[in-house]
C-alpha cells in the first residue's frame, strides 16, 4: 500500500527596527553651504551585546562663481568646490545573531538538529568615507567637468564562516572581522 508522510509547520517571526534621522543644510548668500546629518539605528538583528549604531555626516560646498566677485578663470565660467565625510552601515540578517535549531520528523520520532550558530557580539558593518571634488562649467557653461576623489574604509565587515559539520551546525555563522 501507499503511505504518506504528514508535515505540519508553524512559524512566528518578529523583528524590531528602530531608527532616527536628522539633517540640516545651512546656506550663506547662496555660495557657501554646510550640511550636517546623523542617523541612529537599533535592530533586533544586532547581537545581545550590542545596542545600536550612530552614523554622522558632514559636507561643505563652496561656489566661488556665485560669491559676487567672480570674473572667471580663463575658460572656467562656473566653479563649485566640495568635500564630505560620512558613515554608513550594513546590518546583518534578522536572525544571524541567534542560535537556532530545526525541528525534525522521521519514522523514528521527532527531534531537533542544530541549524545556525549565533554570535551575541554581532554588529553592523560600518563604512567611513571621505570625498573631495569640484564641478566646473567651461566655455560659458557649454561643457561641464566633474572630478571626485573618495576613500572608503570598512570596519567590522560581515563575514560568513563555516564551522566543521561534525559540530552539528550546518549553516555558516555570520561574524564581524576587521
Which residues make up each language-model segment?
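Extracellular/periplasmic, surface-exposed regions of secreted and cell-surface proteins
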Residues: 1-178
Amino acid at each position: 500500500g501507499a503511505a504518506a508522510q504528514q508535515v505540519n509547520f508553524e512559524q512566528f517571526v518578529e523583528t524590531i527596527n528602530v531608527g532616527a534621522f536628522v539633517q540640516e543644510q545651512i546656506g550663506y548668500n547662496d555660495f557657501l553651504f554646510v550640511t550636517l546629518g546623523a542617523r541612529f539605528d537599533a535592530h533586533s538583528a544586532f547581537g545581545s551585546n550590542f545596542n545600536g549604531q550612530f552614523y554622522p555626516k558632514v559636507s561643505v560646498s563652496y561656489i566661488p562663481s556665485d560669491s559676487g566677485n567672480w570674473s572667471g578663470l580663463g575658460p572656467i565660467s562656473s566653479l563649485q568646490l566640495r568635500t564630505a565625510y560620512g558613515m554608513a552601515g550594513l546590518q546583518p540578517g534578522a536572525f544571524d545573531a541567534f542560535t537556532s535549531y530545526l525541528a525534525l520528523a522521521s519514522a523514528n520520532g521527532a527531534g531537533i538538529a542544530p541549524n545556525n550558530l549565533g554570535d551575541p557580539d554581532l554588529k553592523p558593518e560600518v563604512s567611513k568615507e571621505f570625498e573631495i571634488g569640484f564641478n566646473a562649467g567651461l566655455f560659458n557653461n557649454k561643457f561641464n567637468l566633474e572630478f571626485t576623489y573618495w576613500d572608503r574604509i570598512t570596519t567590522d565587515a560581515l563575514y560568513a564562516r563555516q564551522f566543521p559539520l561534525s559540530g552539528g551546525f550546518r549553516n555558516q555563522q555570520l561574524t564581524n572581522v576587521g
